[in-house]
Swiss-Prot record:
The keyword Acyltransferase applies. It comes from the Eukaryota. One of its GO terms (cellular component) is microtubule. The gene is atat-2. It catalyses: L-lysyl-[alpha-tubulin] + acetyl-CoA = N(6)-acetyl-L-lysyl-[alpha-tubulin] + CoA + H(+). Its EC number is 2.3.1.108. Acetyl-CoA binds at F115, F116, I117, V118, P119, T120, E121, Q122, R123, S124, G125, N126, G127, F128. This is Alpha-tubulin N-acetyltransferase 2. It comes from Caenorhabditis briggsae. PANTHER family: ALPHA-TUBULIN N-ACETYLTRANSFERASE 1, ALPHA-TUBULIN N-ACETYLTRANSFERASE 2.
Length: 263
């Protein structure tokens, strides 16, 4: 990607590091090529990654509350022209993170916010050279970095050159690698509270049921008939049977009572 400006007139390195103070110094009124380079590469990066909006722009960087640093990979060509090869935007952010064991952390980490190499400049070591230059300039290790919405290409790049595998994806769309958490102390250690509570509740219910079924009071208590059982015809008292007065029992009854039975 060519730009009609000789960047060597203001840039001192082919991988140029620009802090916010540098960007303010290179104002668009006098150094239009700086803002143009950032905006052009930022737009190309968004299209390449399939993002709905451009996330790297000159004005956004200088207006951002947090300090961010931009790296521009470029080269001089014949005449007053330069070729833009790639861009890398980084900055420190405080993130809420969770490891694979569900421990929670609040960490200020170096974040990789945008990383793009022009397709025609890829597979030539340009990406590794720029990324490695950034790590050295910022004095940070790759496993100490957090990556904002890492693409499949970036994950392959990190695995190929830095042996970083199996990123731990976060709910905030950032990703870190397992070694990020080594030596860090969680702000909220994971404790399976829900599991313990459920276990205690289950034990209490089981204990209550067992004690109710094996109570010595209930075990020896006489059985009471239900209302339905009492209403059955067979349970009502039977009427008195009529005694034949000519039977032995009838003679005895008449003799004992000295009168005839009245029923």
């Amino acid at each position: 990607m060519e730009i009609a400006f000789d960047l060597s007139s203001i840039f001192t390195d082919n991988i140029q590091r620009l802090e916010k103070a540098d960007l303010l110094k290179y104002s668009p009124k006098q150094y239009w090529a700086v803002a143009k380079s950032i905006d052009t590469l930022g737009e190309m990066s968004s299209k390449f990654h399939g993002w709905k909006r451009i996330i790297t722009m000159y004005e956004k960087i200088i207006d951002h509350d947090e300090d961010q640093t931009v790296y521009i990979l470029w080269d001089k060509v014949d005449g007053n022209k330069s070729v833009l090869k790639g861009i890398l935007r980084v900055g420190y952010k405080t993130l809420y993170l969770t490891d694979n064991e569900q421990n929670q952390y609040m960490e200020k980490a170096m974040c990789i916010l945008d990383f793009f190499i022009v397709p025609t400049e890829q597979r030539s070591g340009n990406g590794f050279n720029m990324f490695d230059a950034m790590l050295k300039a910022e004095n940070v290790l790759v496993e100490q970095c957090a990556f904002d919405k890492p693409s499949a290409a970036l994950r392959q790049f990190l695995e190929k050159y830095y042996d970083q595998k199996e990123p731990v994806m976060q709910s905030n769309k950032y990703a870190v690698f397992p070694n990020f958490f080594i030596g860090r102390h969680p702000t909220v250690p994971f404790t399976p509270r829900q599991t313990k509570r459920a276990s205690r509740a289950s034990s209490a219910v089981s204990s209550h049921t067992t004690s109710r079924n094996t109570s010595p009071i209930g075990r020896n208590r006489p059985r009471h008939d239900s209302v339905a059982d009492l209403m059955r015809q067979d349970n009502f008292p039977r009427g008195r049977s009529v005694i034949d007065p000519n039977s032995p029992a009838g003679f005895k009854l008449t003799r004992d009572q000295r009168h005839e039975p009245i029923w």
